[in-house]
């Protein structure tokens, strides 16, 4: 740091006065956030406090992230001085102080310098020295040598106050007069504030952790003793909508069956739209869905239980699927998986909105980092994308400079390296070297044909091979932004315009919020059992539905039956009914002989045990006599041959002689 050309002696910089009562103020703890999402928008309040009197010189609130919420703060020098600079009236022309308009006016032209107290430098002294015991401790101010610093957190400069300080009649007027005391004086201001100061945060201050207030000392540069003023800067971070505590333990308070009042009858009747195009529409009966022209808001602040939350998730999936291709929902089973991931993302191309102030979507970012472990497809990427993830990018943008907020289109999210968010801050993105992919978020719901489910629950289930399971993400991916629809979504308008898709989005938002609240409850819970239970929270939720008969357990999935009448609530009863119908149809197609094996459980075992010996005995009775006769005849023939051989051994053959031959 550059020292002044004509420094004053160090003895002019010292003053022995006790400020022990400031210790309690200097160690005030700020509100901290445990593992927040870097794109989370908070209500950030910055406060400048007079450490001698404890009064606030300035309090500025703004919405923003912890990376870009650093406003420019304006305050008056007398707000951090109070009455501590009021010199004796016998001192000739002191030229400073805040008790009189003339002193406030003369103080305007006096240079000042500021020294940090958070640096803990021994040579700079303590509060009694204004942290400026020796030259070189100053880091900012308004003096002829212009002190600067590369490591301090703030800069303090003089501001400009508009007004006329000397009236035409020779009298004095202007903002240095307090209008509460001099109400008839022209240009008088509130409190006589005519020494404005401007505080700005440096790049180092934007990167530091403001987990507590930080103090500085301000001193006037004048001949003789330099008066001292002490002030602190602190940050208070509050969520936009503070969470409400419910019950002694927040880990499992919502595991309860669906309420009868909130059950949704999802009966739909197809009709043709009256508008141009003639696309078929859907009419909902008793469905708690907001109209298309009004935003979706919860019907009541009452917390919904596990049954309502998960069934609403499947209900929204069914409505979205039925709106795109009703042929798929004639007879099907929609299954929730019990193992993570519970959601999957489809990378898409879309037009995001670029705003300088946080949009409403930025105010609903979860406080914790939620990870999407499965993202497929190719879409829009922003930031520095590593080579391992470039396969997800069809288009890559470097983003924007400055404090901008990029809001994802309705129904989409940004899947960032730091977590899932509907809105990203470019200040955070540039500072952390993060990258984000624009995705559609879909619940992990699998689609099964009824034959597969019924065969699995049949008593004699046989599988040649595992059937291919389709997920809703593959069937509906790409519909929210009006792009090319995958799977069954071809030929329909964008789901973003339908109430069915809005209900699905509302159900997903409620479920994600419940998962995030469970994480928060786990952080605050002191019960070890709840920590073990929450590790498989979704598995417990699905088990709860299975035990209540609300869904059918298929391997590690919780399945709900759906047809054109809607989503069935009592799925186990529906499963038993369909299995009974399937068995009756199977019995009607069997013959009388095949039916014997289904009448008694022991009959099949008995038949299979004695059938072998009976067949052997029957074969012996049928073919035994023939075989025995052939064997006896063979023996007789052999005996005859032996007898002939014996006779030939006892006699000799006589030679025959022909007399006609010589």
From Swiss-Prot:
From which residue to which does the signal peptide run? 1-34
Q: Where is this region: Immunosuppression?
A: 534-550
Where on this chain is CXXC (motif)?
332-335
User: What does UniProt give as GO cellular component?
Assistant: host cell plasma membrane; membrane; viral envelope; virion membrane
Q: Give a short account of what the protein does.
A: The surface protein (SU) attaches the virus to the host cell by binding to its receptor. This interaction triggers the refolding of the transmembrane protein (TM) and is thought to activate its fusogenic potential by unmasking its fusion peptide. Fusion occurs at the host cell plasma membrane. The transmembrane protein (TM) acts as a class I viral fusion protein. Under the current model, the protein has at least 3 conformational states: pre-fusion native state, pre-hairpin intermediate state, and post-fusion hairpin state. During viral and target cell membrane fusion, the coiled coil regions (heptad repeats) assume a trimer-of-hairpins structure, positioning the fusion peptide in close proximity to the C-terminal region of the ectodomain. The formation of this structure appears to drive apposition and subsequent fusion of viral and target cell membranes.
This protein is called Envelope glycoprotein
The cross-references to CDD domains, in alphabetical order and at most eight, read:
HTLV-1-like_HR1-HR2 (cd09851)
Transmembrane spans: 607-627
Q: What keywords are annotated for this sequence in UniProt?
A: Cleavage on pair of basic residues, Coiled coil, Disulfide bond, Fusion of virus membrane with host cell membrane, Fusion of virus membrane with host membrane, Glycoprotein, Host cell membrane, Host membrane, Host-virus interaction, Lipoprotein, Membrane, Palmitate, Signal, Transmembrane, Transmembrane helix, Viral attachment to host cell, Viral envelope protein, Viral penetration into host cytoplasm, Virion, Virus entry into host cell
Q: Which residues are tagged with the site Cleavage?
A: 465-466, 645-646
Motif CX6CC, per the record, lies over 551-559
* InterPro entries per record: FMuLV_rcpt-bd, TLV/ENV_coat_polyprotein
Quaternary structure, from the entry: The mature envelope protein (Env) consists of a trimer of SU-TM heterodimers attached by a labile interchain disulfide bond.
Q: Which sequence ranges form a coiled-coil region, renumbered to this chain?
A: 496-545, 555-591
Please, which domain of life does this record's source organism belong to?
A: Viruses
- The protein's organism comes out as Feline sarcoma virus (strain Gardner-Arnstein) (Ga-FeSV)
Q: Which residues are glycosylated?
A: 43, 58, 286, 322, 327, 351, 354, 394, 410, 430
Domain comment in the entry: The 17 amino acids long immunosuppressive region is present in many retroviral envelope proteins. Synthetic peptides derived from this relatively conserved sequence inhibit immune function in vitro and in vivo.
Region named Disordered: 245-279
Q: Which gene encodes it?
A: env
Say yes or no: keyword Transmembrane helix present: yes
């Amino acid at each position: 740091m550059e020292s002044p050309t004509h420094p004053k002696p160090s003895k002019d910089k010292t003053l022995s006065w006790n400020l022990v009562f400031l210790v309690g103020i200097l160690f005030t703890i700020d509100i901290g956030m445990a593992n927040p999402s870097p794109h989370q928008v908070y209500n950030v309040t910055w406060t400048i406090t007079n450490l001698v009197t404890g009064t606030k010189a300035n309090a500025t609130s703004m919405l923003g992230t912890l990376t870009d919420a650093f406003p420019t703060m304006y305050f008056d020098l007398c707000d951090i001085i109070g009455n501590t600079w009021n010199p004796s009236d016998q001192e000739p022309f002191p030229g400073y102080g805040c008790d009189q308009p003339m002193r406030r006016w003369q103080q305007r032209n006096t240079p000042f310098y500021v020294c940090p107290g958070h640096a803990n430098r021994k040579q700079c002294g303590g509060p009694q020295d204004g942290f400026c015991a020796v030259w070189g401790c100053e880091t900012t101010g308004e003096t002829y040598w212009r002190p600067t610093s590369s490591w301090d957190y703030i800069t303090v400069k003089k501001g400009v106050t508009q007004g006329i300080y000397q009236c035409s009649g020779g009298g004095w007027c202007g903002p240095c007069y307090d209008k509460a005391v001099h109400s008839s004086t022209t240009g008088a201001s509130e409190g006589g504030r005519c020494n404005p100061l401007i505080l700005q945060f440096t790049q180092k201050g934007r990167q530091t952790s403001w987990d507590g207030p930080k103090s500085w000392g301000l001193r006037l540069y004048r001949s003789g003793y330099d008066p001292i003023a002490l002030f602190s800067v602190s940050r208070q971070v509050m969520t936009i909508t503070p969470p409400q505590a419910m019950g002694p333990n927040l880990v499992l308070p919502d595991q309860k069956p669906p309420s009868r009042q909130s059950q949704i009858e999802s009966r739909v009747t197809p009709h043709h739209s009256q508008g141009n195009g003639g696309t078929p529409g859907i009419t909902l009966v008793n469905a708690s869905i907001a109209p298309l022209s009004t935003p979706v808001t919860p019907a009541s602040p009452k917390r919904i239980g596990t049954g309502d939350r998960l069934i609403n998730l499947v209900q929204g999936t069914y409505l979205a699927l039925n709106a795109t291709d009703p042929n798929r929902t004639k007879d099907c089973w929609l299954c929730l998986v019990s193992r993570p991931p519970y959601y999957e993302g489809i990378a898409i191309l879309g037009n995001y909105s670029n705003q300088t102030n946080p949009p409403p979507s930025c105010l609903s970012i979860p406080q914790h980092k939620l990870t999407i472990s499965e993202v497929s497809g190719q879409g829009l990427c922003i930031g520095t994308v590593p080579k391992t993830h470039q396969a997800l990018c069809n288009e890559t943008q470097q983003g924007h400079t400055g404090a901008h907020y990029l809001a994802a289109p309705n129904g989409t999210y940004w899947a960032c390296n730091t977590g899932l968010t509907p809105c990203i801050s470019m200040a955070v993105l540039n500072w952390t070297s993060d990258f984000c992919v624009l995705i559609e978020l879909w619940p992990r719901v699998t689609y099964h044909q009824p034959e597969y489910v019924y065969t699995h629950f049949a008593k004699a289930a046989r599988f040649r091979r595992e059937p291919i399971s389709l997920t809703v993400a593959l069937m509906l991916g790409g519909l929210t932004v009006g792009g090319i629809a995958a799977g069954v979504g071809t030929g329909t308008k964008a789901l973003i315009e339908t109430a069915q898709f809005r209900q699905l989005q509302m159900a997903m938002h409620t479920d994600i919020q419940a998962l995030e609240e469970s994480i928060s409850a786990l952080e605050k819970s002191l019960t070890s059992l709840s920590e073990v239970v929450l590790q498989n929270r979704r598995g417990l939720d699905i088990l709860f539905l299975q035990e209540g008969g609300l869904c059918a357990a298929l391997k590690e999935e919780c399945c709900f039956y759906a047809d054109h009448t809607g989503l069935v609530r009592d799925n186990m009863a529906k499963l038993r009914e369909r299995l009974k119908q399937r068995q009756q149809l199977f019995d009607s197609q069997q013959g009388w002989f095949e039916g014997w094996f289904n009448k008694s459980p022991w009959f099949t075992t008995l038949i299979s045990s004695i059938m072998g010996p009976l067949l052997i005995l029957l074969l012996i009775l049928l073919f035994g006599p023939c075989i025995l006769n052939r064997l006896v005849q063979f023996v007789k023939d052999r005996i005859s041959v032996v007898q002939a051989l014996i006779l030939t051994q006892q006699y000799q053959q006589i030679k025959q002689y022909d007399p006609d031959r010589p």
